[in-house]
Swiss-Prot record:
SMART domains named among the record's database cross-references: Tryp_SPc
Role noted for this protein: Serine protease that initiates the alternative pathway of the complement system, a cascade of proteins that leads to phagocytosis and breakdown of pathogens and signaling that strengthens the adaptive immune system. In contrast to other complement pathways (classical, lectin and GZMK) that are directly activated by pathogens or antigen-antibody complexes, the alternative complement pathway is initiated by the spontaneous hydrolysis of complement C3.
Catalytic activity: Selective cleavage of Arg-|-Lys bond in complement factor B when in complex with complement subcomponent C3b or with cobra venom factor
Region (Self-inhibitor loop): 224-228
Family named by the database record: Belongs to the peptidase S1 family.
Positions of glycan attachment: 46, 124, 176, 251, 256
Biological process, per Gene Ontology: complement activation, alternative pathway; proteolysis; response to bacterium
Entry GO CC: extracellular space
Name of the encoding gene: Cfd
The species this protein was found in: Mus musculus
PANTHER family reported for this sequence: COMPLEMENT FACTOR D, KALLIKREIN-RELATED
Superkingdom as given in the UniProt entry: Eukaryota
Protein name according to UniProt: Complement factor D
Prosegment residue ranges: 21-25
Subcellular location: Secreted
Amino acid sequence: MHSSVYFVALVILGAAVCAAQPRGRILGGQEAAAHARPYMASVQVNGTHVCGGTLLDEQWVLSAAHCMDGVTDDDSVQVLLGAHSLSAPEPYKRWYDVQSVVPHPGSRPDSLEDDLILFKLSQNASLGPHVRPLPLQYEDKEVEPGTLCDVAGWGVVTHAGRRPDVLHQLRVSIMNRTTCNLRTYHDGVVTINMMCAESNRRDTCRGDSGSPLVCGDAVEGVVTWGSRVCGNGKKPGVYTRVSSYRMWIENITNGNMTS
């Protein structure tokens, strides 16, 4: 489904970046109440969960661009909505084929910037109490440091790499970007288009990439990268700020696929 072709040198460089700044890293959280987060999506490749996502409306899901690294036209990409458990039968869960995959034009495997992707479902999602969109934060203002925000996903929940079958959630505290960029943390690589959250033994982990960071009633960020070791307090979790990409998201979801 992901048709972009990268030069070999770019792929090698991208691998080096990811080794230093691993992608998608819920550790230290707890199981979410079933269907309490009806906006959550599971992005799946060939039937396997790879990333989280946010349902924006009946046809569009927002996630992280790096989730499609290595995915080809021969792979099957689907989005699961209405799920708490990835495997157990549930009355409201349904898989949707993906009609279009639209990565941000600035996203590249050798870069941490512009790490967003939009999936257009092949048919409208059936909305209700268990499947419901969540609004994005479009006001371009910083979230105050110390603000408590929620993140959820089906990613790794232990250092041993155990992946849960049910949705887990975590509350994190927003960190000042200047602090996050200190040499002892991320050493200047966090840009104005990113935001940080404290990660001391409580963090997103592998498989949580693309999941929304929810502050109040809006999506403020998308899980993108962090530490090689999830929950490392010296490597805060980093999220892509959605307000920085308002125009791109609106253009694509309103039908301007060339944006």
